[in-house]
């Protein structure tokens, strides 16, 4: 009887979710209540976790708690430590939930709310959550090895070496785009810059406090750090109101890029306990706390989505990012649905912390469910804004101009009527000098959060504080990701350089570490700086390249797991990784090809393609006589050439992994030949 009631309850959940999703898809009004989205997502995620993740865990992967995990076998109290699954879940979620789920859906909102909602909900349950879960499983069974090492073991040394080069390149693009989000949020914002600058001495104070005064008191020091952050936000307001202080803390995007490069270099060579660890604790508590409060606030306020279900920009003519709904929506949403970056985390620190194999279900699948919830919240923050305001914030200066009146006129001509006064009022309410062309996701998310708080408290004067709190919240964990990403990429560079000159691969060598860090920062710093001087704002051209590379990395990770499952003889079960791998690679190969197509009569495709842009710029160079304009065009030509080369390189790496994967799987299925042999570690019984 009880079993029947439970089954009926799940049937009700499924029907309720389908009805809510149907309402979102078929609604024809100007706005729709966000509660339809909240209920639909709760139902779909519940069903996905309860049934699909259970099927994967016990019918496909066959998780075995009697088998000792790497954390138990190699417990050293440092890198390998068996940890409670709730703590491991928090660590893993904090590590994967970077800027991606906040930025991608906000950019994709230019096409309307419906395409993003469908892709986030369906794609994450069947693709992204599966990706994180199965890569974590593969790493657990291989002594916690990294993605590159696992590809080398399961597909051969040559493929592993090429894949490692590709992974490093993708990592540098990821760090650059993370830093770009911070630059876009802090440019010309003395309040924001002062607050973020204060987090450095606060983090150092926390590190010293925990190292020498109160060791291991993580909660205590995080509370102290949080109080100091709130004080810094309040102080930032008075800094912005004082003309002299405001001028000291106001910087152009280019200057901020150099500062972040310097910060990334210094932070990644300092001892972890001095800056990175305390900042990580603080950002983790902030991240989980803010997201939890925001979910409750959205349910409580239930603001209407004002952005249309589908906008005219599905054809790719939108100002925020280049490309049509297929395939560029998928690579734009990126981390909100599936992210190759997560494969690096799922094969990094997390597999070294799991106490039992069954914990991988909550940590791997469950954390990605939470990340896609963050993506939906970001979409809500963008969607509740007046569409005209959304485009004012996210359209590049070259499209709408510098003047508020001009921007309002241009945006209104697109069919999203807004007055200059409405833009000025929002600018004043959040305590900024301008909100025009602040593409990057962070300002849009922050304004959306501030508006939700305003609806609760009913006082517009609170918006400035909550806007800057949200900027602090985002910048804090993004800069933590920049620290950690630079450190991780440094290890990758040293591993590769060690094959050329052995001393450079010595991780204990301070000089080798500094040299590798310089190469790393130069790599991502180049893309960051070029993005800041890009006339379209950097995000317009960098984010699609990030999306293509990130999704290709996810495809390669899923191919690795498919190879592993075929070697284990689980041919039918391998469809759980093979199907999303084929879909993701098909989408990214198509988008990658479009990005290197020659010039055509289609203006949308020309905006997407780096090669087409090179041809257009070459024509302009031939007609330009002004020396300054000529230098700008030559720089732009060079940048597009680099982006095109990288795009082709990433596609070739993914194609190599795909070909080798097909060969290994076909040999295993048709000839029963397993080569290279399965690299799974021997079974050791758990204590």
From Swiss-Prot:
Which stretches are transmembrane?
A: 6-26, 29-49, 87-107, 117-137, 162-182, 190-210, 221-241, 256-276, 285-305, 325-345, 373-393, 440-460, 462-482, 513-533, 546-566, 574-594, 642-662
**Mostly located where?**
membrane
A single GO cellular-component term on record: plasma membrane
Any Pfam family from its record, for instance, is CstA
Topology versus the membrane, per the UniProt entry?
Answer: Multi-pass membrane protein
Specify whether Membrane is a keyword of the entry: yes
Question: Got any disulfides in this one, which pairs?
Answer: none
Biological process per Gene Ontology, one example term:
cellular response to starvation
Localization annotation: Cell inner membrane
Keyword Protein transport in record: yes
Keywords noted in UniProt: Cell inner membrane, Cell membrane, Membrane, Peptide transport, Protein transport, Transmembrane, Transmembrane helix, Transport
Read off the PANTHER family from this record: INNER MEMBRANE PEPTIDE TRANSPORTER, PYRUVATE_PROTON SYMPORTER BTST
Family assignment from sequence similarity: Belongs to the peptide transporter carbon starvation (CstA) (TC 2.A.114) family.
Please give the function described in this protein's UniProt entry.
Involved in peptide utilization.
Entry protein name: Peptide transporter CstA
Q: Species name for this entry?
A: Helicobacter pylori (strain J99 / ATCC 700824) (Campylobacter pylori J99)
